[in-house]
A protein has these predicted regions:
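Membrane-interface extramembranous regions
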Residues: 1-135
Length: 135
C-alpha cells in the first residue's frame, strides 16, 4: 500500500517535471553544466525520459511485467545523471526566475538525491531492500 502510493506520487512528480522540461526548458538549461554537449537536446531528452519513466512506473505488472522495474532503474539512473546539474545549481548559485536559492534549499536537495535514487528503485520494484529479500 505504501509502495503503491509512493510509486504514484513519484510518477506524478516525474510526469510533471518531464512536461516542465519540455514546455519551460530555460530553468533547466540555466543549471546544465557547461561540459554537457547539446544542452537543449539533453534537456528535452531528460523530459521525455521522465515522462516515459513515470508512465512505466504505473503500468500494471500484469500488462508488461518488466515495465515497472525497468522504469525504476531508468529513473534511478536519470536521478544519478542529473545530479551534476544540482551541484552546478548549488555551487554556482544560479538564480532561477531571478531568485537565488539559499543553502537551506540546496543542502537538503543535494543530500536527498540518493534517497530519490533508492525510491525510484524501490517504487519500481527493482529492489526490495531494506525491507525484505527479493526471494
Amino acid at each position: 500500500m505504501i509502495r503503491a502510493g509512493l510509486r504514484w506520487l513519484l510518477a506524478v512528480f516525474y510526469f510533471i517535471a518531464g512536461v516542465a522540461h519540455l514546455c519551460s526548458p530555460m530553468g533547466f538549461l540555466a543549471i546544465t553544466p557547461v561540459w554537457v554537449p547539446f544542452p537543449p537536446e539533453v534537456v528535452a531528452f531528460t523530459g521525455v525520459a521522465e515522462i516515459l519513466g513515470a508512465i512505466g512506473l504505473v503500468i500494471p505488472r500484469t500488462w508488461i511485467g518488466w515495465a515497472r522495474p525497468a522504469a525504476g532503474i531508468g529513473l534511478a539512473l536519470y536521478a544519478l545523471f542529473v545530479w551534476p546539474a544540482n551541484f552546478n545549481h548549488a555551487f554556482n548559485n544560479i538564480p532561477l526566475g531571478g531568485v537565488a536559492a539559499s543553502w537551506w534549499y540546496h543542502g537538503p536537495r543535494l543530500l536527498a538525491q540518493p534517497l530519490i535514487i533508492w525510491l525510484a528503485l524501490w517504487a519500481g520494484e527493482a529492489t526490495h531492500w531494506p525491507f525484505r529479500s527479493k526471494s
